[in-house]
Structures are given as C-alpha cells and as structure tokens.
Amino acid sequence: MFSLQDLCRKHLFILPDVFGEHVLQRLGLYWRCHGSLQRVGDDHILIRRDLILSTNEALRMAGEEGNNEVVKLLLLWKGNLHYAIIGALQGDQYDLIHKYENQIGDFHLILPLIQDAKTFEKCHALERFCGVSCLLEHATKYNMLPILQTYQEELSMRAYLRETLFELACLWQRYDVLKWIEQTMHVYDLKIMFNIAISKRDLTMYSLGYILLFDRENTEATLLTQHLEKTAAKGLLYFVLETLKYGGNIDIVLTQAVKYNHRKLLDYFLRQLPRKHIEKLLLLAVQEKASKKTLNLLLSHLNYSVKRIKKLLRYVIEYESTLVIKILLKKRVNLIDAMLEKMVRYFSATKVRTIMDELLISPERVIKMAIQKMRTDIVIHTSYVWEDDLERLTRLKNMVYTIKYEHGKKMLIKVMHGIYKNLLYDEREKVMFHLAKLYVAQNAATQFRDICKDCYKLDVARFKPRFKQLMLDCLEIVTKKSCYSILEILEKHIISLFTMKVMTEEEKNLCLEILYK
C-alpha cells in the first residue's frame, strides 16, 4: 500500500468537495470523531475544513487516543514523532509507544518538550537503565521543580546528589530550583553559585546568591573581598555595585580597575574621589604600565596637573613606565629635565638608556646631565648610541665646548681619551692631531702627553712635518691660563724637534720665546 496512495496523501493539500466520508476513510484522510484531515503548509492541518491545528499538536492528540493510523499520516506530513509519544504517555497508550520504541532510541530527547511533571516522570521511566539520580538531573535541567519536591526526603539524605543538583542548577541557570534547594535543605557552600554567576555574567543569579547568603546571616568580609577582586578584574560594574550593597572596600575595585584597564568601571567611581586618591591611582597606573586610555582618564580628572611630580617621576623611572610622560608632553607639561635629573642621579646606565630611547630624548641631553652629576658610566653607555667610534669622538668633542664646569670637561676628556685608546692605530692617526689641540686648549696635560707619544710612532716621513705643525698650532692656542705641565711638554718637544733637525735654532728660540713670554 505504500505506494501511490501514500504518495498522494503526503502531497495532497486540497481536498475535492466531491470526496465524501467513505472516500476519505478509504484514502486514510479521515479521523474518527474529528472529521476530515487536510494538510495546510508544512506544519499545520485542517480538521473538518474549519479547525486549524499544528501538526505536532494533532500528533499529541492522536497519540493520546492511540490512533496509529492518524499518527502515521501526520508523520508523513512532517510531524515530530516525539509529540505522539507525549500524547501516548498522557493517555497511557503503551502499545503505541512500543510500536515506535526503536525509532525513538533515547527517550531523554523527548523530555524538553514535556510541560507537566507527571508525563515527564513517565517518559523518563521508559529509559530502563536510568535511576532516580538521572531523573532528578533532568528535572533540574528542565526546571521540573514538582519532581524535585516529590523526592525531597531522598535529597535531604543524599548530600552529594543535592550538591550536584545545585551546581547543575547554577550551570543551567534554574533560579527556582536554586532557591528551593537552598531554602529547604541548604547546600554546603554557595561559592560555586557566585563563581558560575560571574563566569556566565548572570547578575540575576549573583543577586540571588547574596539574598540566600543574607538569609543565612553570613556575609564574610573575605568573601566580599574575593568577589570585588573577581568582578572588578573582569570589569563587571553592576556586579561590583551589587557586592558593595553588602559591604567591602572600594579601594579593591579601583586597584583592579586600574590594573586591568577597565575605564568604564574606573570612570564611575573617579567622580566621587578626592584629588589625592586619584593621584595615588595614577601612581598605581604607572606601576602597572596601564594603557594610554586609562592614564588619560586619570589625568583628565586631575586636569593634567600633577602636584606630586617627584613621586611620579620616581615611579616612571623605577618601573620604566614612560607613557605618562609622553601624554603630559603632548599637553605641554614638560617633565623631561626634572625626570632626567632623578634618572641620572639614582638609576643604572642601562635603565637610563632604555628610558632615553622610549621618550626620544637626545643622547647629548642625557650626557650633559650625566656629566653634571659625574656619572661616567652613563656618559660611556649613552655614547654607544653612535656606533662608529670616530663619530662618537666627534660628537663628544663638540660637547666639550658647551660644558661650563671644569670638572665636567675633565671627565668628558677622560672618556674621549679612553675611546681614542681603543681605536685601531690607523684610525688613531685620523684624529690624534685634532685631539692634541683640544687637549692643549683644555689643559688636559696627561692626555696631551700620551697622544704626543703616539705621534712619535708614526713613520719619519709623515711624523716630522705634521708634528712640527702641531707644535706651531699649539703655540697659538696656549694662553696665560695654560697650565705649567702643558708648557713643559711643548718645550720638551720643541727641543726634541730641534735635536732631530726638524727645526732650526732660530725657529726653536722663537717658539720658546712665544711659549714663555
């Protein structure tokens, strides 16, 4: 019979008026006690040509009556077999259920469609290998509180099952079940409820947790602290506000908001804070290397005016967190000089170099401050920004003339001479005569004496004329302020040049006269 008749029944949407009851019965399009059946669209039927029902509701009714012929017809019309089983359970039509048992497979799949507790329990009973625990888990999942109430005595004796159901109710967000379990039997620990509420961002469950906790007359300070830390770390403003209703320290919230860059949370509370408190938060933001937007938010509430400059600079340098300085520079609040002074005085050359690179401070500016504070290590380390040694010497040489303090000049010349001594001999020759004149001008006798020795190491053809010219140039540089040691060195080499017959006696006498006039 499958065949043409079934094919017709499946696709027949319009019944001809000439079809009488007998013809409809023969076609299987007649429902006893109800009337003719006609398909309407994909998911509805028409009974007696005037009553429209959903296909699944009709299946439930047919199942309740145990009318397998109508069930088969409605299944052809894309009905869901699960509704036929629900109806069969409501009408105790177990013969019909057994006919479709193999097609169902797992009766648990039907449970979400069932509205009443009695049918729910009867459906679960069809699963032969499931016990009470499984029934109660599914009752929790689908919010069948009456079933749980039926088994209240058993739950009160089985603590593990009770705790499990409570946790499942949290995961499935079944508030009525949560309330009933806690109020009738209590659970060992409500922390699981709060943890799940926070992870699911479920404010309703979170609030319910505090209601249940308050009913116990137990709001521990440690628990409030933990909740404030967790919710503020995640930026959950409304969870934070809910917690603060029951107590807790707002400083915890602000600390977490700064640490995790939750500006919405921070902005909500900043309006209520005094200036000193905001300045402390700014220091924390520097310490935690907060984002640009977080720093801008804090600074905007301070009108970009920071009173505790020294402390701010100490934090910037100590935690190598220079972003706040960049922001203030854009607002024309120049803290570079003040920061450099602190930085050079107290911190290592490596740390100074790192901050210099971050803030794009010129090396010359850092070196001058380091010379002022007599930090030779910083001068040397910073000068390595110029990779070429000859360039380093040239840059430092130019700086000598801009330094006012004699002790600073001497220190810089020592650094320069150290760089010179590390040059290859061929490279030394390129700068030795220029440096020698600088040393004479700056009364650097020790360095001048040493560089003159290097000049003697040149081959004779190059040495004699160039060294003679160096002595003549130095005579033009010497002044009344030149130290006695420089004069002695010049005298020695002038006499030496005369001995080597590079100078005439007349030239020698003239040079010595100029030297000591």
UniProtKB/Swiss-Prot annotation:
Upregulation: Expressed in the late phase of the viral replicative cycle.
Disulfide feature: none
Signal peptide: none
Source domain of life: Viruses
Keywords noted in UniProt: Late protein
Family: Belongs to the asfivirus MGF 505 family.
Record function comment: Plays a role in virus cell tropism, and may be required for efficient virus replication in macrophages.
The protein's name in its UniProt record: Protein MGF 505-2R
Species: African swine fever virus (isolate Tick/South Africa/Pretoriuskop Pr4/1996)
Taxonomic path: Viruses, Varidnaviria, Bamfordvirae, Nucleocytoviricota, Pokkesviricetes
